[in-house]
Amino acid sequence: MPYFDPTPRIISQSLEELRFIFSWVKDHGETSQDPVTILIGGWAVDAYNPWYGSVDIDLVTNSRTKHSLKYALKNDRGYGTYEMWGESKSVSKQTDDGDIKEIIIDFISRELIKFQGNQTDFDFNIPMEQTAIKEIRGEVLAVVPKRSLLFLMKLKAAWDRTYRIRYNKCHNEDWERGKLVKDYADIIALIDPGHGGAELEIGFLGEKLNDYDFLKKCLENIPENLDAIRKYGRMSQHDVKDTIGQLLSLIG
């Protein structure tokens, strides 16, 4: 399996950072009825199907909250600026966890963001009706995208990562390949019929995958990634292939 194997300890540390973030968000006036900050990525997947968690924390928010929260993280939690793809939109905190040296908090703007290597836009200005309030590990209440939208976001993450690997755009290919395995495993977690996969909205996905037709190929590739299937560990390759085949058939 490509390198990316966090310990339970660093995932627990990440959960503690997540608790701080959403406590800060609540203390600064955000409400679930009018959310500004939305959790995406691996921790959002875990809110629907607790299977692994995450090291990094991915947040969609506005510019004002981003700057204020970054300031609080640097002053109260020991974070520093982290540059990703030449931009300093993220912050990171050093850990003492052997191989994985830091927890990264990535801030995504509420705007149109292109797929890498593609001129198609994905809208990260998430409407309130496409959000849900979920409890993570019985410890953190967070606003997350609805399962179907989160599924599309994870497909976008896998598409972008695959593009970076294929065209040598990544800083650390082994790390990227390991993260791609995690992306695929998260997608499997979202479609697993034994853990809420039936919640996926076929009409919504059909409309969106008509716009993002190229993502269907990304989805079709997942059953061939045995590392991802082993990492998720709750479905066989046959079941993953069958579930994805049924989903694509229903979407049309």
For the regions a language model picked out, list residue spans one by one.
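Compositionally biased terminal segments of proteins
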Residues: M1-G252
